């Protein structure tokens, strides 16, 4: 069997009920009851579907419906039945005379569920707070590291020796670098002075050409074939012979120079 078409395809009304529709529904149910909700709208002369008539009767038009707030006993009963039945609101409403499933569902979502969630959230916060209190354990690690035993004197002495040796090696390197730079500068100065002196005293070819081209007329350099070349006396030789003549008394016979 197929499902009956919805209200829109059959031209039925939807939306809020009017007071006239409520009176027609109540009068029909009081006379004939509500054995078949699907056939009831046609029998009562209402342009409504069977589901809409049933919900209107159960939730609003029943004469035994309780109005007002739920008592403490009713709320405890709803909580207990919800733990057993879950969201079966019609079954829960059957255990509570005068209360509709719609009212029970509304009071559950607006009040009772929040009341039950508050302690759970508090426990969750407490659990998270307990975890936060456990975090300082990690803070003990730096303290343990700080409380480690100090280094032995031998290690400290060896470290100081190594540091001093490194410092001395660095100083020696700097000293050697300074000495090498100073020696390099001295060599450069000597080379520059040598080059300047060589440039000052450099004799070119013109000097020798001028010397060789000088005339020899003024010099009596005639030599006989048998004579040997005698070097001219030097100043030391002249002083020597002059001293000899002075001692022998023959210096008076020498001509005046």
Swiss-Prot record:
<feature type="compositionally biased region" description="Low complexity">
    <location>
        <begin position="141"/>
        <end position="170"/>
    </location>
</feature>
<dbReference type="InterPro" id="IPR009057">
    <property type="entry name" value="Homeodomain-like_sf"/>
</dbReference>
<dbReference type="GO" id="GO:0003677">
    <property type="term" value="F:DNA binding"/>
</dbReference>
<dbReference type="InterPro" id="IPR015495">
    <property type="entry name" value="Myb_TF_plants"/>
</dbReference>
<comment type="function">
    <text>Transcriptional activator involved in cold stress response. Regulates positively the expression of genes involved in reactive oxygen species (ROS) scavenging such as peroxidase and superoxide dismutase during cold stress. Transactivates a complex gene network that have major effects on stress tolerance and panicle development.</text>
</comment>
<dbReference type="GO" id="GO:0005634">
    <property type="term" value="C:nucleus"/>
</dbReference>
<keyword id="KW-0346">Stress response</keyword>
<protein>
    <recommendedName>
        <fullName>Transcription factor MYB4</fullName>
    </recommendedName>
</protein>
<feature type="domain" description="HTH myb-type 1">
    <location>
        <begin position="9"/>
        <end position="61"/>
    </location>
</feature>
<keyword id="KW-0677">Repeat</keyword>
<feature type="region of interest" description="Disordered">
    <location>
        <begin position="115"/>
        <end position="179"/>
    </location>
</feature>
<feature type="DNA-binding region" description="H-T-H motif">
    <location>
        <begin position="37"/>
        <end position="61"/>
    </location>
</feature>
<dbReference type="GO" id="GO:0045893">
    <property type="term" value="P:positive regulation of DNA-templated transcription"/>
</dbReference>
<feature type="compositionally biased region" description="Basic residues">
    <location>
        <begin position="130"/>
        <end position="140"/>
    </location>
</feature>
<keyword id="KW-0539">Nucleus</keyword>
<keyword id="KW-0804">Transcription</keyword>
<feature type="DNA-binding region" description="H-T-H motif">
    <location>
        <begin position="89"/>
        <end position="112"/>
    </location>
</feature>
<dbReference type="InterPro" id="IPR017930">
    <property type="entry name" value="Myb_dom"/>
</dbReference>
<keyword id="KW-0805">Transcription regulation</keyword>
<keyword id="KW-0238">DNA-binding</keyword>
<dbReference type="GO" id="GO:0009409">
    <property type="term" value="P:response to cold"/>
</dbReference>
<feature type="domain" description="HTH myb-type 2">
    <location>
        <begin position="62"/>
        <end position="116"/>
    </location>
</feature>
<dbReference type="InterPro" id="IPR001005">
    <property type="entry name" value="SANT/Myb"/>
</dbReference>
<dbReference type="Pfam" id="PF00249">
    <property type="entry name" value="Myb_DNA-binding"/>
</dbReference>
